[in-house]
Amino acid sequence: MAVPRRKTSPSRRGMRRSADAISKPTYAEDKDSGELRRPHHLDLKTGMYKGRQVLKAKSDS
């Protein structure tokens, strides 16, 4: 069984764990409707993505 030669230092342990942090999602303001949406995601209310109609817009009913 493999055994580490040296004890992992606190600095190296912290650098390894730095990638585990969870960041809050970013939002971008939609140019047409002015509502917030995720970047690189389509707007589900209007069905638009990059200025093109991709899906049918949700109806209010």
UniProtKB/Swiss-Prot annotation:
Sequence ranges of Basic residues compositional bias: 1-16
CC terms in the record's Gene Ontology section: large ribosomal subunit
MF GO annotations: structural constituent of ribosome
Region (Disordered): 1-61
GO biological process, one term: translation
Ranges of Basic and acidic residues composition bias in the record: 27-44
Pfam families according to UniProt: Ribosomal_L32p
Segments forming a coiled coil: none
Superkingdom: Bacteria
UniProt keywords, alphabetically: Ribonucleoprotein, Ribosomal protein
UniProt similarity note: Belongs to the bacterial ribosomal protein bL32 family.
Full protein name: Large ribosomal subunit protein bL32
Protein species of origin: Nitrobacter winogradskyi (strain ATCC 25391 / DSM 10237 / CIP 104748 / NCIMB 11846 / Nb-255)
Organismal lineage: Bacteria, Pseudomonadati, Pseudomonadota, Alphaproteobacteria, Hyphomicrobiales
